[in-house]
Amino acid sequence: MAAAAAAAAGPVFWRRLLGLLPGRPGLAALLGRLSDRLGRNPDRRRRRSPWLLLAPLLSPAVPVVTSPPCCLCAEGVHRFQWIRNLVPEFGVSSSHVRVLSSPAEFFELMKGQIKVAKRRVVMASLYLGIGPLEQELVDCLESTLEKSLQAKFPSGLRVSILLDFTRGSRGRKNSRTMLLPLLQRFPEQVRVSLFHTPNLRGLLRLLIPERFNETIGLQHIKVYLFDNNVILSGANLSDSYFTNRQDRYVFLQDCPEIADFFTELVDAVGDVSLQLQGDDTVQMVEGMVHPYKGDRAAYCRAANKRVMDVINSARMRQQMLHAQTFHSDPLLTQEDAAAAGDRRPAPDTWIYPLIQMKPFEIQIDEIVTETLLTEAERGAKVYLTTGYFNLTQAYMDLVLGTRAEYQILLASPEVNGFFGAKGVAGAIPAAYVHIERQFYSEVCSLGQQERVQLQEYWRRDWTFHAKGLWLYLAGSSLPCLTLIGSPNFGYRSVHRDLEAQIAIVTESRALQQQLHQEQEQLYRRAGVVSSATFEQPSRQVKLWVKMVTPLIKNFF
């Protein structure tokens, strides 16, 4: 009994224990994952021991902040400043942050931003669809590029598009063919990069059918950037994401440092990707190792260096900018200080870009997410949403073993993006039901139904793709932090794909209210999951799906 309890509580125990030691916050997550492997029970189907509930008694310490805390920051924000040890911290005014609510608003904003762009358009997505709405976007790009050439004083507009190679090359008409006219007409201004995972190579690449090769790994980042304005989202560039596929979107207006960071990030991934040519061929940047023909280790090292150089240089720039702005030379006159204050008002909101690229040994998002879940205190509320409910073991352990209340929003089978698909893909919603039921059963076996609640999103003729979380501190009716971007909190997001999201920390009541309304709008269309949910005829999972799910759950 004692051995079983230790194995069950192990992952959280080691995170708590390491939290008492000085050092990087990521060490807790790292040791927790090591404990996951060492403490795994050979009989994976056996229920976790109720001793898991003892894990919260090991109270964590707030991760050490190596940078000096800013006296201008509210005390409630201090607890998250450790994130800047890992990534750049961008302080902005909350008036520059707008939360979008609908696919139509997202689509219209993108078109409007493209039309007025003067310097740069940077778009990273899984793929670009081939329908009339997607063509509208391409036409907007073409028109804006044309105007930039005809202007009396050419603006030097540059367009950079990053997509996934496998998804963007599927079928005779695809993302590549949609973008070829732009490349052919504006070869000096347009760049199209197609990321190919280094894990799909050799015999595996030859044998896996086109429809399934994307399961090995993808470019999954979604960022849409226009001059100094940035949209972070989980939405792709496809018609359903512009009409009836619910996602999340945040618009950062006039944020040049953030725009520069994501431009450099997309450029970095683009540099290690295949470059689309005007004749629909692809080639690598000169001197770069090929992702699936070259040495895998050498390619991953080069990619790691390229991306980490962007992250680290931006982090240093922001630290210097922060010091110059808010910790200036005491010999400055009062007039100089006032003038500096006029140029850059004290921020009330902080943006942290969280990058996850496990193929390149970059796991910042994983570290930050695990630490946030570990630090969620008794009385805090975490609203976590994912279109594909398939949490990693580490995330599940933290949800079940920590003290915060959890409201987890997921897609009902009818609004799952694979619902009604042909062939094997049509069984994927049933596999998610099976995973959901297993998790719900575990919650019940631990007596956690009041603290951890599942809710299913449903909306007629819509699908659900929203992901992220909102954190409400104990005693607060509004969130002070949200995560928004591309990760789904599943195995793929952590281990296979390239992901990016941002943590938004704010003390602005107006922005907190925006985030709260966004959360309420999504959860308003949800129903609470109970044991009766799984008794419905539509929730009966075939035996073969139950048997196959453990084997394939790490691929979707």
UniProtKB/Swiss-Prot annotation:
One of its GO terms (cellular component) is mitochondrion. PROSITE patterns: PLD (PS50035). It is an enzyme of class 2 (transferase). The modification Phosphoserine is found at S49. GO terms for molecular function: ATP binding; CDP-diacylglycerol-glycerol-3-phosphate 3-phosphatidyltransferase activity. Activated by calcium and magnesium and inhibited by other bivalent cations. InterPro entries: PGS1 (IPR016270), PLipase_D/transphosphatidylase (IPR001736). GO terms for biological process: cardiolipin biosynthetic process. Signal peptide: none annotated. It is found in: Mitochondrion. Keywords: ATP-binding, Lipid biosynthesis, Lipid metabolism, Mitochondrion, Nucleotide-binding, Phospholipid biosynthesis, Phospholipid metabolism, Phosphoprotein, Repeat, Transferase, Transit peptide. Residues 1-28 form a transit peptide. SUPFAM superfamilies: Phospholipase D/nuclease. Pathway: Phospholipid metabolism; phosphatidylglycerol biosynthesis; phosphatidylglycerol from CDP-diacylglycerol: step 1/2. ATP binds at A124, S125, L126, Y127, L128, G129, I130, G131. Its EC number is 2.7.8.5. It comes from the Eukaryota. Residues 215-241, 419-457 form the PLD phosphodiesterase domain. Belongs to the CDP-alcohol phosphatidyltransferase class-II family. This is CDP-diacylglycerol--glycerol-3-phosphate 3-phosphatidyltransferase, mitochondrial. It comes from Bos taurus.
